[in-house]
Amino acid sequence: MKANIHPAYAETTVVCGCGNTFQTRSTKPGGRIVVEVCSQCHPFYTGKQKILDSGGRVARFEKRYGKRKVGVDQVAAYPEQNNK
């Protein structure tokens, strides 16, 4: 490797918006990185994640057309289709 071309890789303190701090190594000058979200406060890691239905499309479809029953009732209702 060439000498004096690589950036300095030093200890850095990462500070989260929730107050959590931890040490890592980085090439960013200043020795301090401020982040908005970390593993201590992110909903995915804390288990408080909410799953959002995109507009309720499935629920709206089922409300309009209803759930169809597939089974003995439909087979008995259309005997001509069963003879094919």
UniProtKB/Swiss-Prot annotation:
Purpose: Binds the 23S rRNA.
Biological process, per Gene Ontology: translation
Subunit structure: Part of the 50S ribosomal subunit.
Keywords from the named record: Metal-binding, Ribonucleoprotein, Ribosomal protein, RNA-binding, rRNA-binding, Zinc
Domain of life: Bacteria
InterPro entries: Ribosomal_bL28/bL31-like_sf, Ribosomal_bL31, Ribosomal_bL31_A, Ribosomal_bL31_sf
Protein name (record): Large ribosomal subunit protein bL31
Residues engaged in binding Zn(2+): 16, 18, 38, 41
Record has rRNA-binding as a keyword: yes
Cofactor dependency: Zn(2+)
Record family assignment: Belongs to the bacterial ribosomal protein bL31 family. Type A subfamily.
Pfam families: Ribosomal_L31
Organism: Mycobacterium leprae (strain TN)
